[in-house]
């Protein structure tokens, strides 16, 4: 197995000249197929995982970035050369609420304090979910906090805020929500989720320039093939990866197993249905960011299925 190289962004320039450089936030579950593919399946020269995400593509030494679709769209505003080339995982986000706060339905969240990470996919999730119940911004209060991925969770983290009743509910990525369930007990919480209203589309990104460079594109295609092998394990033989994934992000395996099924591992669809979904989310993002929404033509250009198509051809 290939050794996995984990470096900070500041170390990018010292990486080998031929290394494929992939940027992702290494704290979250969503990135783990990237790390696993590098260590176990990538057949290119070398690959290096560095801290970052889609925004790291502004550094020309970075070939690929991994992030939620929310950050992809936000970065596309000023970087029309960015391309979404693959889906790593689609995640059904959950909102956990304290029943003792009088919450049994989404409508009961009116006037409540809801924890989330502003400016992220989690905030989009909260807005879309509550909008489906007829609640608009101003009818509830958003509270920032810290994400805890492994118990015990300290002061200021969402699970602790929920337990102390400084917030009534929160929604963010896993395993943080599951820890909120455990903090209060399953019988004392209510869970809300709806993938048809919001799901995180954690994706792989590159730039138009990288994809037009034959040597770089070849490495990227090889990496997508490695990801496809990883997805197969994550979907069909998760028992083989639970321990490794838990170690990568510092979470307990029993908690990880409870949230695994809310993660639909790639490759996902890069067709018109994805563009439909991005167009739907873009209506909210453009209004929230005070800018003009992307046209459907611009969103269609943003999604580039050709790398995945190349990866599916015999090597």
Where are these regions (language model features)?
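Conserved C-terminal helix/tail region of periplasmic/extracytoplasmic solute-binding proteins
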Residues: 285-315
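Short, glycine-/small- and polar/acidic-enriched structural segments
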Residues: 20-158, 168-174, 189-198
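Short glycine-centered helix-capping/turn motifs at secondary-structure transition points
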Residues: 39-41, 60, 165, 283, ...
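Secondary-structure end/capping motifs
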Residues: 213-293
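Fungal secretory targeting signals
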Residues: 1-19
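Short polybasic/polar patches that bind polyanions
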Residues: 76, 131, 182, 247, ...
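Pocket-lining segment of extracytoplasmic ligand-binding domains
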Residues: 69-70, 145-248
